[in-house]
Amino acid sequence: MTEDNAEGQETALSSQNLVSVEITLPKDVSGASKPLTVKMAESDTISDLTSTLGLLSSMRDLTNYYVFYRNTNISETFDELCPISEVISALRVESQPNVKLELRHKPYTLAAVYEHLNKFREVIGLHFIDRRAFELGELSGVGKFDQLQLSQVPDQKEDEKEKVDLGEDDKASISSICDRILDETKLDLSEYGKFYDIYSDLQVPIKSLTISQWSPVSPKEAVRGDLLYLTLQTLENDTYHITCHLSGFFVNSCSTVNFNPARKPSHEPKFLFFDLVSSLSPAFAKTIARNEEILANSSRYAESYLIPSHTSGSYPWLVDTSAISRKPDQSRPQLSILNNGVDGSDNVKDWNEDFQAIRELPSGTVNERILRERLAIKLVSEFTKQATETAVNIIKGNLTPMNPNESVEQHIYMRNGIFYSSGVNATGAFDETGGNEAARYAAAKDLAGVKLLNRIDAKGIYHLATCVVDYMGRRIVCQAPVPGILNDPIVESDEAPADKVCYGLSTDGTKVYSDSQFHEALKPIAEAFHMKPHKVTLPNGFKTKEDIALSKDSKGIRGTDGRNYVIDLYRSTPLDIDFIEKHWRPEHSDSYPHRETVLRHEAVEEWWRRRALAIFKSETERLEAEQGAKKNEGESEKPQILLDAQKVSFNPDAFTHDEVDEEDKEVVREMSLFVTKQLIEEFVEESKKQLCPFDGSHLSSLLHKAGINLRYLGLIATRAQESLEAFEQEEKSKIEDNEKAIEEEKKEEKTEKKEEKEEKADEEKSENEEDKTKPEEPSKGVFDPIKANLNSVRLLAIQEMIARAVKHIFRSFAHTLSSYLLPYFVAHFHNCLLGSQVSSKPEISIDETLTAFADPDALRFITLDHQQVVSMVEEEVLLRFRFELPENWINAVSPITMMREISHKFGIQWKTQGYAFTAEGFKEFQQSTENIIVHKQKSSKKSKKRSSPSVEEVFKRKTIFVADDIISFTPSVKSSSYKATLLDEIFEAARGKIAAEEKDSGVTLLNELVSIYEQIYGVVHPETSNFYSVLSQFYSDLGFTTEASEVARKACVLFERTAGFDSFETISSYINSAYFEAANSSYVNAFKLYEKALGDWDFVFGSHHPSSVTTLTNLAEILAQLKITDKANRLFSAALELSEKINGEDSQITAMIHYRFAGTLVNENRFDEALGHFEKAHTTFSRHIDPNDRLTKDCSNYVANLKTYIAYMKQQAKDKNKPKKVKAPPVPPQATTKKSKNKSKMAQTQISKLHLNSSTRFSSSSRVKPRLKKK
């Protein structure tokens, strides 16, 4: 974004004129005695005003009203999208402090009653309970943040001292946290999977509310104003029949068997349904108040329980069944009546028309862009939700296809304006490139192209709302179809139907169409994708006369609405030809599954950037040389550089069996090699010093951002191993060179005379005293956990390959399994894969009532055993990732970690319990899960009066997993939702202001941005979470420690709910939040957050994550500063033990921990132990860095001085304990005491300096710096 644009965004946001609007409520509304006052921008619309009013507590029940200015009905006179400024101008509102408006009751219609009843359900809290009832899994959006019970963030005052004295209670709390951190037996899944679900504590304030059996209203009563009849049962068990009238609500005289719509005089009518129920049930208002109190007390952050508006919550892979609660509600099955409108058509949407209409909205001003982006994100969210629910029903077999006579994979559906297909090779387009596997891959790449088009926002060309749903092993592609594409054209019997494709490859694949209107509209997209206009020659000899902008496989279709649509964007990046030529051999059994392997958009963008930069640099040098020659000749014209787009673009149809220029092929080959030769090499190199990924999802995310496809996971693992071996060899050579240098120094020291040594020491002392003012030379040590990082990346890559291979195996079995047999298969497969220590041939028992409906071929999984499953995984990994798993790989991976990874990949929710994977642990697990089933024996008719005898049967599991352990399967949804470009522009403007030292303006923009994020995405959304994380970092850098802590806490809550309670985003946010809490001197809070992060690491990765070493060491130093020395020493010891395990005992990082630990021990006057650690550090530093490095010299000095000091103290103690003699010979003072006292004094001086000399830190910080996602 240019500087002018940045200034424009700031001006647009800061210069909005605010209008104070005073609202007078109807007299019968609670709180109507005082007018309401709200602040609105002049650019806000009437719709914005009504939305704002709906958020006010006093307006929460009022849904049906007119807005009046004096006697002018604004609601009827002006459009709801009319800006307030136009209303003020049109009505000639007098200039006064407030614009005075009045709300008046509007007569109800049946549609308004439906809306009012829906609002009533929301007000009394039923929407919380409805959300749980209609979820596609269990306990979505739960978290653990509130379980930490953090104290309130203190206000940090400027004059507050940095030193904080903790009370004994706080020290005891921190000590107990440290004990839990150091507890090696803390891996307990039965506790790890427990959550507090706020909604489970809420009580329904009424017993039931249903549409009465007397509905619909008869024409006779409708004439009198009756709209609907309801039946209400209160908590007092009283039943009321209620009439919804145009004037409001009242109790009628109906009963269950008699119809009498007359009003009961004993009950007053009310305009608001809430007021009527409150008058009928005293417990109603009390229950609502109690529910509100529960929500308020459960968390200080409303983000913990607010319902996500534009996204879905994350489903946990572990589910505590005790937290699952079901609240009865007879009106819930009738919600479709209320939501679908009077004629049932409100839920039927023309998604495509709505989507395109929003894209056509004006976007000239900031407010217009905010409105447009908000509506677009909202619509995409609603589309994805609707599509996901329908896709799940399709997979479960609940819906009838349009083509029921074809195979299941070929079935297509058209439901509620959305077209559904199975993402298979239905048209035969991928017959030669992999069939169904290629079609499945292409569906995901098409979606990636749609997401990019959403951001590009090209004019004159349209694309489709799209999402992809994976559920129980099947994929459903959901799209809002092009208008008219499903209509069959009317043709004569002897004529072929007209092709609906106007641009690109024809439906039958025999020709390529061109169209000037499409071509011009597609040019901006081609430029954004860096595609080269090109001609196409098909294998059948057909040649295009004109260039086409995109790949020939991307089709242009003109809809019946007159809009031009582009579809099939799966080839918007070039083929990965290097990978294809090496691994696509369809005639071989070990061939890669398909040939549709394309590069990622991130890789193309990076290739384009580097190539353009190289061309620009070359041209600059050439023009500068020419300019220099012209200056000599007297010419001074400034050169201009124009970048030829042809030099930095590619032909997307290269290597697609079409005839293409060799030059175009070479460019695509260069791009393919760019990934393997540069991006992967750079990724492995950066992995040495960057924060190591936390889990497979984190690794996958990093690879995608780097432009690396996951098919290269095998190459990543291989290169990590090779890089590790090279590093170890380099270290070995360095050690040999340093050891030679040490030996040479020792020889030189032996040849020196004692007098020369003392003279040299005096000279060095004087030199040191002279050089005190000189800056200290930094150490050459490298304290990145290179060995641990490379090992971890390799392990994570292998784990990710295994988990993804298992997902593909599940998918292959799921095609023949019904939904009710899938839990048995998944549980059995897990027993075979992870339970070999319990049984290599696990048993499986399936209910006969289920097997009776199953195809015998579908039950082939029953015979699987451990060795077969291991072989299947090895073959799948080799097939998809070109990597041979090492021997005994199953023993190298953590069962819990693998169970979690597979659960995330396939969408499995397991019952929370202490799964055990060893023979010893399984025996305890068996006992803890024993169930006693009571069977009652049948009694004869003669003995009916006698009680039937019962028989107890003990169910004892024989395997780790059983089908009942699977709580649910959840869908994995790939949406076309995107990051609004406006937000990036405002953020860059704010960052520019801060960088330019305009702190106040920058912070104001950031605060405005918080509001805009919540407007566009809603409060509970991954993008909002990410921005909170970035904002907390900015606040911290600006010195706003209190604000940083508050915002970081919200980021933790939101990431837990949207990304997962143990996702890498959540763990990172906890680490950052802990850092900010410590910076704010809230050490108890910081340690609670660190404990949660470290605990998650243990489950997600294992206790040996490279960053755990840094975290433990930093915590130890914090404890040392807080004078909690015993726990500090234990954490230092734990960090040392872990570092020796993952970095090596003889490594720079381990030596640095010795160095820091020694400094802490000196502070505790534990000189003997400190000496031992300094000696170890000195040995390692001299061997790995340099004998003359600053750290090596420092350690040498500390060792020498500590030895001298310890010897002196021992001598002092010895002299003190000597018995006094009567006579002592006179001793010359200078002959015996001066030298020893000087040495002791020097040693004490050096030791006192050591207290301040433990500031060297690892370059790989345990704190994760949040960054905005690259798009």
Swiss-Prot record:
Composition-biased stretches (Basic and acidic residues): 729-763
Low complexity compositional bias, start-end: 1254-1263
Family annotation (Pfam families): CLU (PF13236), CLU_N (PF15044), eIF3_p135 (PF12807), TPR_12 (PF13424)
Superkingdom assignment: Eukaryota
Region described as Disordered: 729-783, 1212-1271
Gene Ontology cellular component annotations, sorted alphabetically: cytoplasm
CDD domains per the UniProt record, alphabetical: CLU-central (cd15466)
Gene Ontology molecular function terms on file: mRNA binding
Skewed-composition ranges (Polar residues): 1241-1253
Start and end residues of each Clu domain: 329-580
Protein name (record): Clustered mitochondria protein homolog
Source organism: Meyerozyma guilliermondii (strain ATCC 6260 / CBS 566 / DSM 6381 / JCM 1539 / NBRC 10279 / NRRL Y-324) (Yeast)
